[in-house]
Swiss-Prot record:
This is Ribonuclease P protein component. It comes from the Bacteria. Keywords: Endonuclease, Hydrolase, Nuclease, RNA-binding, tRNA processing. The keyword RNA-binding applies. One of its GO terms (biological process) is tRNA 5'-leader removal. Disulfide bonds: none annotated. It comes from Rickettsia akari (strain Hartford).
Amino acid sequence: MSITSLKNQKEFELINKLGKKFHERYFILVIARNLPTIFLKSQYNTFLGIKVSRKLNKKAVIRNKIKRRIRHLVRIIVSDAKLSAVKFAMIIIPRKGFEEINFSHLNYELSKIVLRNI
């Protein structure tokens, strides 16, 4: 089971249009299940897009750390047996305070939303 990233603006816009948005305190999550044919032909089941703006933190090192944390969270959640067979795409947009909150709380919040809506 592997995860591939959304590559270009067109893919991000498509998922934003087709997906359902969830606003949490530390992040915004967009999940799309009914994927168009460009995604269905792919060998991957999970597509991930991460948007970390400069407003969140000016330092690139911190923004990259946030992206690594998000990728790791998604790997943990998607490794669940229920999600390994489902094709879906998601975009995660972290908010202020994301880098300070502990990992287990983020894991709980994200998995709660993903498992409920997949």
